[in-house]
């Protein structure tokens, strides 16, 4: 007596289900974006929402922070974009556009998810405030050098007068 477990069609279906089980994780992995790809998608969204005349393109991507492996968890990002010569009205990838000379630079921060299916981001951009911070750093370092230089000069003057001995007449 043959049971339905002995039928050849059940064996084929079992094989198909087994293969599907092996292939599905690969399909899920293929939907995960790289950190840079997620940022580029966010820039596309920024360009779509922007009221500026020209497209923006990635200028600098800050180093990727240490992250967990969950592609659905929002990942912090920080990057700068610069205005290109391409008008927003044309259907062109910003990567194909040259940067505009003296184009506006914006500093963007927020979060992105690496799950391509969710494709979510929360980014806000502002004029590049890091330049002001960098200027502050330069001024602070210059001030520190000036203080060290003045201390050095003061020490030399002190040493000079310390070496002078009064002359005695004989």
UniProtKB/Swiss-Prot annotation:
Residues 1-30 form the signal peptide. Residues 31-131 form a propeptide. Keywords: Antibiotic, Antimicrobial, Cleavage on pair of basic residues, Disulfide bond, Immunity, Innate immunity, Secreted, Signal. Disulfide bonds join 86-97, 108-125. It is found in: Secreted; Vesicle. Residues 150-162 are annotated as: Active core. Proteolytically cleaved by proteinase PRTN3 into antibacterial peptide LL-37. Proteolytically cleaved by cathepsin CTSG and neutrophil elastase ELANE. GO terms for cellular component: extracellular space; vesicle. Belongs to the cathelicidin family. Antimicrobial protein that is an integral component of the innate immune system. Binds to bacterial lipopolysaccharides (LPS). Acts via neutrophil N-formyl peptide receptors to enhance the release of CXCL2. Postsecretory processing generates multiple cathelicidin antimicrobial peptides with various lengths which act as a topical antimicrobial defense in sweat on skin. The unprocessed precursor form, cathelicidin antimicrobial peptide, inhibits the growth of Gram-negative E.coli and E.aerogenes with efficiencies comparable to that of the mature peptide LL-37 (in vitro). The cathelin-like domain (CLD), which is the propeptide part, does not seem to exhibit auto-inhibitory function, as it does not inhibit the antibacterial activity of antibacterial peptide LL-37. This is Cathelicidin antimicrobial peptide. It comes from Ateles fusciceps. The gene is CAMP.
């Amino acid at each position: 007596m043959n049971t339905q477990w002995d039928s050849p069609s059940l064996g084929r279906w079992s094989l198909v289900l087994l293969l599907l089980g092996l292939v599905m994780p690969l399909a899920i992995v293929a939907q995960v974006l790289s950190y840079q790809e997620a940022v580029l998608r966010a820039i596309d969204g920024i360009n779509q929402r922007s009221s500026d005349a020209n497209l923006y393109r990635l200028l600098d991507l800050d180093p990727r922070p240490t992250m967990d492996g969950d592609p659905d968890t929002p990942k912090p990002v920080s990057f700068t974009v610069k205005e290109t010569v391409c008008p927003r009205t044309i259907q062109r990838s910003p990567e194909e556009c040259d940067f505009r000379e003296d184009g506006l630079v914006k500093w963007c921060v927020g979060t992105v998810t690496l799950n391509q299916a969710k494709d979510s981001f929360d980014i806000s951009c502002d004029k590049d405030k890091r330049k002001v911070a960098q200027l502050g750093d330069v001024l602070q370092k210059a001030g520190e050098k000036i203080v060290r230089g003045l201390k050095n000069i003061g020490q030399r003057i002190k040493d000079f007068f310390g070496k002078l001995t009064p002359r005695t007449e004989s």
